């Protein structure tokens, strides 16, 4: 009997293990994309399992985003009891960085036709929930989320997490509601049901992912899984320099009135930059929108392009 650690599989391509998960079927393309996110990033857990590849609009399917096994099971029971169907199961636990939660949300929102987004776990998670909130906010903004999202983030710093969700998600077409440990999965499932019914039968339309273009002339440094850009010319008009304070690990400093690394680029790349997304969100909403963090998801743009093509073809055929 031989056991291979999930995080060691990538070191042994000779074993032919494509996805280190105990599936009872070959992995779907979206599951392959999700696993590549998890494969080499040891920080926290990201598990994604697609429960329905076909999620037609009006079919009561929702995207499910859990945190921890037991709490996720209770939360799934709660939404199933309201008549919803699960397009997927997802778990981001073990104190993942905001960047991993962001990627999880982007992958969940690559399923056309879902009518809502439901995130709920144990309610007492021992992880910094503001990281989850920032990851969700970044994904929801990029997606211009237009379906309701009910997010239950019970655990450490849940009050701050709920504030982040409800403050920075206000301008989106879809309504976002944040809840904590005192709100039961059943109550939160009821809120999702009410919001979905209020919106009507329209399902989520998956959007293409535009090619990323690096900001010209920006100050930049690599992070563990991405790259951060600062348009220093825009920083001249910044009044607060609040990104310095917002940065949790305190790796930024001011130089000539603009933020730069206070550590070496190598230290940032190896993990001193935790990809918490705090500087980007602060600058976007409170200052000059001069900071952006690019977090690529290999294969997702191509996957979505295929979905969009099928949707457009179906729309054309429906009008013939």
Where are these regions (language model features)?
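ATP-dependent carboxylate/acyl-activation modules
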Residues: 1-116, 141, 161-162, 166-170, ...
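Cofactor-cradling patches in redox/metallo enzymes
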Residues: 111-138
């Amino acid at each position: 009997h031989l056991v291979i650690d999930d995080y060691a599989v990538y070191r042994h391509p000779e074993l032919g293990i494509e996805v280190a998960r105990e599936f009872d079927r070959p992995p779907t393309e979206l599951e392959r994309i999700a696993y590549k996110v998890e494969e080499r990033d040891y920080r926290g857990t990201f598990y994604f399992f697609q429960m329905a590849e076909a999620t037609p609009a009006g079919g009561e399917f929702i995207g499910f985003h859990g945190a921890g096994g037991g709490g996720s099971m209770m939360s799934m029971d709660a939404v199933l009891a309201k008549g919803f169907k699960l397009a997927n199961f997802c778990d981001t636990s073990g104190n993942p960085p905001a960047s991993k939660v962001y990627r999880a949300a982007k992958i969940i929102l690559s399923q056309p036709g879902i009518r809502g987004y439901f995130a709920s776990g144990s309610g007492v998670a021992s992880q910094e929930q503001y990281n989850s909130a920032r990851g969700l906010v970044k994904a929801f903004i990029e997606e211009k989320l237009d379906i309701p999202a009910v997010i239950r983030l019970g655990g450490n710093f849940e009050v701050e997490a709920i504030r982040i969700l409800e403050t920075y998600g206000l301008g989106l077409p879809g309504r976002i509601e944040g809840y904590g440990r005192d709100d039961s999965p059943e109550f939160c499932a009821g809120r999702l049901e009410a919001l979905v019914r209020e919106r009507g039968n329209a399902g989520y339309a998956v959007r293409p992912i535009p090619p990323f273009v690096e900001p010209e002339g920006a100050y930049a440094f690599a992070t563990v899984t991405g790259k951060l850009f600062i348009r220093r010319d825009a920083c001249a008009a910044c009044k607060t320099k609040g990104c310095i304070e917002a940065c949790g690990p305190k790796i930024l400093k001011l130089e000539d009135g603009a933020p730069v690394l206070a550590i070496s680029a190598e230290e940032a790349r190896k993990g001193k930059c935790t990809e918490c997304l705090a500087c980007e969100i602060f600058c976007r909403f409170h200052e000059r929108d001069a900071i952006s963090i690019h977090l690529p998801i290999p294969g997702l743009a191509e996957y979505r392009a295929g979905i969009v093509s099928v949707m457009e073809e179906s729309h054309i055929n429906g009008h013939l």
